[in-house]
């Protein structure tokens, strides 16, 4: 075969999620979309906030096309990065600046550049807690590392710390956490994050090298009934936050998100530069320019107040 076998396999065989999505479209054509309940892709059924369309309208009317559609800085427009930092600082009492952010084509790109930046050997490992988004394995392996899966406590899908500690080795580069979790919906409490931080601090010292938390957070705002989703960087210094606006602003097809590299990260400027280099090597330079401007205007809005009535109707 004159093409890469692993890439051929990925391209010729859909994931189970994609298979279900395509099957759902086929069934909708037969029985009507209103009769098909699609639990495959995370496509929101709630429209984007009015701010999104209003901002797009204003941008197309007031900006020239070169300014609107041209390249931004590789790491993203500084005004957008600062707007995100200001919002997070106000909301979570963090202390980020624009320089902590690298804007990406969504959380998938964020994770991919982090895996590429941190992987230095084919023996390197990233751990995740089951159940998990199946593309984690694709992203990790495509960037030259191995994915290690740790089973959760099956009663509540929380972290089994005994199993996690056994899984950590001298090759562990990071632990991927996804809270609120896709697909279980589990949320890790502050106490859980603190316990995870203590374990990784201990293991980092034993290994003589930092073990990172990669906090995959596209569902951060989708937590109900007063459930708190702790901001992980406040509890563990070596945390890289991978975020997408796909869910919070109902923009999955626009591919816009970011990586945060806090100043507290070990050799943070080196890590940031490696992430920027990974973005360059993987072709993820310059997130969609118009939607960078949309995010600057709409940052902080969430669909939770819109989707809550739908949720209540579904569970009543």
Regions found by a protein language model. Give the residues of each.
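Conserved core of the PLP fold type I
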Residues: 65-208, 220-235, 240
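Conserved core segment of the aminotransferase class I/II
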Residues: 237-307
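Residue-level marker for buried hydrophobic side chains located in beta-strands
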Residues: 213-214
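N-terminal small-domain helix-loop-helix segment of the aminotransferase-like
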Residues: 2, 6-106, 298-300
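Positively charged, low-complexity/disordered segments
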Residues: 308-310, 315
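Walker B catalytic acidic pair
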Residues: 217
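Alpha-helix termini
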Residues: 26-33, 63, 91-93, 119-121, ...
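Short catalytic/ligand-binding loop motif for oxyanion handling, primarily in non-cytosolic enzymes
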Residues: 45-49, 183-186, 221-222, 250-252
């Amino acid at each position: 075969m004159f093409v890469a076998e692993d890439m051929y396999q990925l391209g010729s065989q859909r994931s189970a999620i994609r298979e279900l999505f395509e099957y759902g479209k086929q069934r909708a054509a037969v029985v009507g979309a209103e009769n098909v309940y699609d639990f495959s892709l995370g496509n929101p059924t709630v429209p984007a906030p009015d701010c999104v369309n209003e901002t797009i309208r204003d941008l197309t009317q007031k900006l020239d096309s070169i300014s609107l559609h041209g390249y931004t800085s590789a790491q993203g427009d500084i005004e957008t990065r600062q707007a995100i930092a200001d919002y997070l600082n106000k909301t979570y009492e963090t202390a980020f600046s624009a320089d902590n952010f690298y804007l990406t084509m969504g959380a998938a790109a964020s994770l991919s550049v982090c895996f590429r930046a941190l992987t230095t050997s084919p023996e390197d490992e990233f751990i995740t807690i089951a159940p998990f988004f199946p593309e984690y394995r694709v992203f990790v392996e495509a960037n030259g590392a191995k994915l290690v899966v740790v089973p959760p406590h099956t009663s509540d899908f929380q972290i089994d710390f005994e199993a996690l500690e056994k899984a950590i080795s001298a090759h562990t580069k990071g632990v991927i956490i996804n809270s609120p979790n896709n697909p279980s919906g589990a949320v890790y409490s502050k106490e859980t994050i603190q316990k995870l931080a203590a374990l990784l601090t201990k293991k980092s010292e034993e290994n003589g090298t930092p073990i990172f938390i990669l906090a995959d957070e596209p569902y951060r705002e989708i937590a109900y009934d007063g459930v708190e989703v702790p901001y992980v960087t406040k509890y563990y210094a070596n945390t890289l936050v991978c975020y997408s606006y796909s869910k919070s602003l109902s923009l999955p097809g626009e591919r816009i998100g970011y990586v945060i590299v806090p100043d507290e990260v070990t050799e943070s400027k080196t890590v940031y530069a490696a992430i920027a280099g990974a973005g360059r090597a993987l072709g993820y330079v310059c997130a969609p320019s118009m939607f960078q401007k949309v995010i600057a205007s709409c940052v902080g809005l969430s669909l939770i107040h819109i989707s809550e009535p739908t949720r209540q109707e579904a569970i009543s």
